Amino acid sequence: MRTIVLSAGHGGSDPGAVGNGLRESDVNLAITLACRDYLNDSYSGHRLFLPRDKDVYVSLPARRNLTTSVNADLYVSMHNNAASNPAGRGFETFTHSGPLFASTLEYQKILHAQVWRVLMQQGTLNRGTKRANHWVTRNMPAPTVLMEYLFVTNAADAAILKKPGMLKTLGEATGEGIAKILKLPAKVVDTRRWIVIAGEYESEQIAREKAYALKGLGFHYATVDVKKN
Protein backbone atom coordinates (compact mmCIF):
# COMPACT_ATOMS: atom_id res chain seq x y z
CA MET A 1 0.00 0.00 0.00
CA ARG A 2 1.55 3.29 -1.13
CA THR A 3 0.79 6.53 0.68
CA ILE A 4 0.45 9.80 -1.22
CA VAL A 5 -0.10 13.35 0.00
CA LEU A 6 -1.79 15.62 -2.56
CA SER A 7 -1.34 19.16 -1.32
CA ALA A 8 -3.33 22.02 -2.87
CA GLY A 9 -1.26 25.14 -2.30
CA HIS A 10 -2.57 28.19 -0.43
CA GLY A 11 -6.28 28.38 0.53
CA GLY A 12 -8.65 30.29 2.78
CA SER A 13 -7.12 33.60 3.84
CA ASP A 14 -4.18 32.96 1.49
CA PRO A 15 -5.40 33.05 -2.13
CA GLY A 16 -1.89 32.76 -3.58
CA ALA A 17 -1.39 34.47 -6.92
CA VAL A 18 -4.32 36.45 -8.32
CA GLY A 19 -4.71 37.51 -11.93
CA ASN A 20 -6.94 37.46 -14.99
CA GLY A 21 -10.00 36.58 -12.93
CA LEU A 22 -8.31 33.59 -11.27
CA ARG A 23 -7.31 32.88 -7.68
CA GLU A 24 -4.44 30.44 -7.54
CA SER A 25 -5.81 28.69 -4.45
CA ASP A 26 -9.04 27.82 -6.31
CA VAL A 27 -7.18 26.50 -9.35
CA ASN A 28 -4.82 24.46 -7.17
CA LEU A 29 -7.72 22.88 -5.32
CA ALA A 30 -9.63 21.97 -8.48
CA ILE A 31 -6.58 20.22 -9.94
CA THR A 32 -5.91 18.41 -6.66
CA LEU A 33 -9.48 17.12 -6.31
CA ALA A 34 -9.45 15.92 -9.92
CA CYS A 35 -6.19 14.10 -9.25
CA ARG A 36 -7.66 12.47 -6.14
CA ASP A 37 -10.78 11.33 -7.97
CA TYR A 38 -8.79 9.95 -10.90
CA LEU A 39 -6.50 7.91 -8.68
CA ASN A 40 -9.40 6.56 -6.61
CA ASP A 41 -11.44 5.67 -9.69
CA SER A 42 -8.62 4.15 -11.74
CA TYR A 43 -6.08 2.61 -9.36
CA SER A 44 -5.87 0.53 -6.20
CA GLY A 45 -3.07 -0.14 -3.74
CA HIS A 46 -2.82 3.39 -2.36
CA ARG A 47 -3.91 5.73 0.42
CA LEU A 48 -4.49 9.41 -0.34
CA PHE A 49 -4.25 12.27 2.13
CA LEU A 50 -5.15 15.88 1.34
CA PRO A 51 -4.12 18.64 3.75
CA ARG A 52 -7.13 20.52 2.41
CA ASP A 53 -10.10 19.49 0.29
CA LYS A 54 -11.91 22.82 0.53
CA ASP A 55 -11.08 26.52 0.65
CA VAL A 56 -9.30 26.67 4.02
CA TYR A 57 -5.85 27.78 5.11
CA VAL A 58 -3.44 25.03 6.18
CA SER A 59 0.05 26.07 7.27
CA LEU A 60 3.17 24.52 5.79
CA PRO A 61 4.21 23.02 9.16
CA ALA A 62 0.76 21.40 9.45
CA ARG A 63 1.20 19.91 5.99
CA ARG A 64 4.59 18.57 7.03
CA ASN A 65 3.13 17.09 10.22
CA LEU A 66 0.47 15.27 8.22
CA THR A 67 3.09 13.92 5.83
CA THR A 68 5.15 12.67 8.76
CA SER A 69 2.20 11.08 10.54
CA VAL A 70 1.09 9.03 7.52
CA ASN A 71 4.66 8.05 6.52
CA ALA A 72 4.10 9.23 2.96
CA ASP A 73 5.87 7.70 -0.03
CA LEU A 74 5.30 10.82 -2.15
CA TYR A 75 4.29 14.44 -1.58
CA VAL A 76 2.98 16.40 -4.56
CA SER A 77 2.52 20.13 -4.04
CA MET A 78 0.00 21.59 -6.49
CA HIS A 79 0.59 25.24 -7.40
CA ASN A 80 0.24 27.75 -10.18
CA ASN A 81 2.66 30.54 -10.88
CA ALA A 82 2.90 34.33 -10.97
CA ALA A 83 5.35 36.94 -12.22
CA SER A 84 5.68 40.70 -12.01
CA ASN A 85 6.16 40.67 -15.78
CA PRO A 86 2.83 39.57 -17.30
CA ALA A 87 4.70 38.04 -20.24
CA GLY A 88 6.03 35.29 -17.96
CA ARG A 89 4.32 32.00 -18.71
CA GLY A 90 4.76 28.24 -18.95
CA PHE A 91 4.99 24.99 -16.99
CA GLU A 92 7.76 24.05 -14.59
CA THR A 93 8.37 21.65 -11.71
CA PHE A 94 10.73 21.91 -8.75
CA THR A 95 12.62 19.75 -6.32
CA HIS A 96 15.00 20.93 -3.62
CA SER A 97 18.41 22.30 -4.56
CA GLY A 98 20.04 20.52 -1.61
CA PRO A 99 20.08 16.87 -0.48
CA LEU A 100 17.24 14.75 -1.86
CA PHE A 101 15.69 11.34 -1.44
CA ALA A 102 17.33 9.10 -4.03
CA SER A 103 14.12 8.76 -6.05
CA THR A 104 13.06 12.42 -6.13
CA LEU A 105 14.62 13.51 -9.41
CA GLU A 106 13.21 10.50 -11.24
CA TYR A 107 9.77 11.18 -9.75
CA GLN A 108 10.00 14.80 -10.91
CA LYS A 109 10.97 13.71 -14.41
CA ILE A 110 7.98 11.36 -14.69
CA LEU A 111 5.45 13.86 -13.35
CA HIS A 112 6.80 16.66 -15.53
CA ALA A 113 6.66 14.55 -18.69
CA GLN A 114 3.13 13.34 -18.00
CA VAL A 115 1.70 16.83 -17.46
CA TRP A 116 3.67 18.33 -20.35
CA ARG A 117 1.95 15.86 -22.69
CA VAL A 118 -1.23 17.85 -21.97
CA LEU A 119 0.21 21.36 -21.90
CA MET A 120 2.38 21.03 -25.00
CA GLN A 121 -0.85 20.93 -27.02
CA GLN A 122 -1.92 24.29 -25.57
CA GLY A 123 0.85 26.49 -26.97
CA THR A 124 2.48 27.39 -23.66
CA LEU A 125 6.17 27.04 -22.75
CA ASN A 126 8.06 24.18 -21.16
CA ARG A 127 10.22 25.89 -18.54
CA GLY A 128 11.70 22.55 -17.53
CA THR A 129 12.53 20.57 -14.41
CA LYS A 130 14.25 22.78 -11.85
CA ARG A 131 15.77 22.73 -8.39
CA ALA A 132 15.39 25.55 -5.84
CA ASN A 133 15.26 26.19 -2.10
CA HIS A 134 11.49 26.25 -1.53
CA TRP A 135 10.31 25.50 2.02
CA VAL A 136 8.05 22.69 0.85
CA THR A 137 10.72 20.82 -1.10
CA ARG A 138 13.30 21.38 1.64
CA ASN A 139 11.28 20.28 4.66
CA MET A 140 8.93 17.47 3.65
CA PRO A 141 9.85 14.02 5.05
CA ALA A 142 9.11 12.32 1.72
CA PRO A 143 10.14 12.66 -1.93
CA THR A 144 8.53 15.96 -2.92
CA VAL A 145 7.70 17.50 -6.29
CA LEU A 146 6.36 21.04 -6.57
CA MET A 147 4.11 21.50 -9.59
CA GLU A 148 3.83 25.00 -11.08
CA TYR A 149 1.30 24.36 -13.82
CA LEU A 150 0.81 27.78 -15.43
CA PHE A 151 0.99 31.52 -14.70
CA VAL A 152 -2.31 33.04 -13.58
CA THR A 153 -0.73 36.46 -14.23
CA ASN A 154 -0.29 35.69 -17.93
CA ALA A 155 -3.40 36.21 -20.06
CA ALA A 156 -2.67 33.30 -22.43
CA ASP A 157 -1.89 30.84 -19.62
CA ALA A 158 -4.96 31.98 -17.70
CA ALA A 159 -7.09 31.37 -20.79
CA ILE A 160 -5.78 27.80 -20.89
CA LEU A 161 -6.70 27.26 -17.24
CA LYS A 162 -10.20 28.59 -17.93
CA LYS A 163 -10.87 26.12 -20.74
CA PRO A 164 -13.73 23.72 -19.91
CA GLY A 165 -12.33 20.52 -18.45
CA MET A 166 -8.71 21.73 -18.39
CA LEU A 167 -8.24 21.59 -14.61
CA LYS A 168 -9.71 18.09 -14.57
CA THR A 169 -7.35 17.06 -17.37
CA LEU A 170 -4.34 18.46 -15.51
CA GLY A 171 -5.38 16.62 -12.35
CA GLU A 172 -5.78 13.37 -14.25
CA ALA A 173 -2.39 13.77 -15.95
CA THR A 174 -0.80 14.34 -12.55
CA GLY A 175 -2.57 11.27 -11.21
CA GLU A 176 -1.34 9.19 -14.13
CA GLY A 177 2.20 10.33 -13.40
CA ILE A 178 1.82 9.36 -9.74
CA ALA A 179 0.49 5.94 -10.74
CA LYS A 180 3.54 5.41 -12.96
CA ILE A 181 5.93 6.52 -10.23
CA LEU A 182 4.52 4.20 -7.58
CA LYS A 183 3.55 1.42 -10.01
CA LEU A 184 -0.03 1.40 -8.76
CA PRO A 185 -2.17 -1.50 -10.00
CA ALA A 186 -5.03 -0.48 -12.27
CA LYS A 187 -8.50 -1.32 -11.05
CA VAL A 188 -10.14 -4.19 -12.90
CA VAL A 189 -13.44 -3.08 -14.40
CA ASP A 190 -16.02 -5.84 -14.78
CA THR A 191 -17.62 -5.26 -18.21
CA ARG A 192 -19.87 -8.31 -18.11
CA ARG A 193 -23.61 -7.80 -18.46
CA TRP A 194 -26.24 -9.87 -16.69
CA ILE A 195 -29.78 -10.77 -17.74
CA VAL A 196 -32.62 -11.24 -15.26
CA ILE A 197 -35.60 -13.33 -16.35
CA ALA A 198 -38.64 -11.96 -14.56
CA GLY A 199 -41.09 -14.80 -15.16
CA GLU A 200 -42.89 -17.21 -17.49
CA TYR A 201 -46.59 -16.80 -18.25
CA GLU A 202 -49.24 -18.80 -20.11
CA SER A 203 -50.77 -15.64 -21.60
CA GLU A 204 -49.01 -13.21 -23.92
CA GLN A 205 -51.21 -10.41 -22.58
CA ILE A 206 -50.13 -11.08 -18.99
CA ALA A 207 -46.49 -11.28 -20.09
CA ARG A 208 -46.73 -7.88 -21.79
CA GLU A 209 -48.46 -6.36 -18.75
CA LYS A 210 -45.60 -7.56 -16.56
CA ALA A 211 -43.09 -6.17 -19.08
CA TYR A 212 -44.77 -2.77 -19.07
CA ALA A 213 -44.68 -2.79 -15.26
CA LEU A 214 -40.93 -3.40 -15.41
CA LYS A 215 -40.58 -0.54 -17.89
CA GLY A 216 -42.34 1.73 -15.43
CA LEU A 217 -39.66 0.87 -12.88
CA GLY A 218 -36.94 1.91 -15.31
CA PHE A 219 -35.93 -1.54 -16.59
CA HIS A 220 -35.32 -2.49 -20.20
CA TYR A 221 -37.43 -5.44 -21.22
CA ALA A 222 -38.14 -7.93 -23.96
CA THR A 223 -40.88 -10.53 -24.32
CA VAL A 224 -39.90 -13.85 -25.85
CA ASP A 225 -42.21 -16.53 -27.24
CA VAL A 226 -40.93 -19.81 -25.76
CA LYS A 227 -42.16 -22.83 -27.72
CA LYS A 228 -42.92 -25.87 -25.58
CA ASN A 229 -42.00 -29.34 -26.88
Positions of predicted regions on the chain:
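Catalytic-core environment of secreted peptidases
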Residues: 1-20, 76
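Solvent-exposed beta-strand motifs enriched in subsets of small alpha/beta binding domains
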Residues: 187-229
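Loop/helix-junction capping segments adjacent to catalytic residues or to phosphate/diphosphate-binding pockets
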Residues: 22, 57, 204
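Active-site-proximal helix/loop segments of hydrolytic enzymes
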Residues: 2-4, 26-191
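Glycine-centered flexibility sites
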Residues: 9-12, 16, 90, 150, ...
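Residue-level detector of conserved, well-ordered beta-strand and adjacent loop positions
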Residues: 7, 94, 148, 199, ...
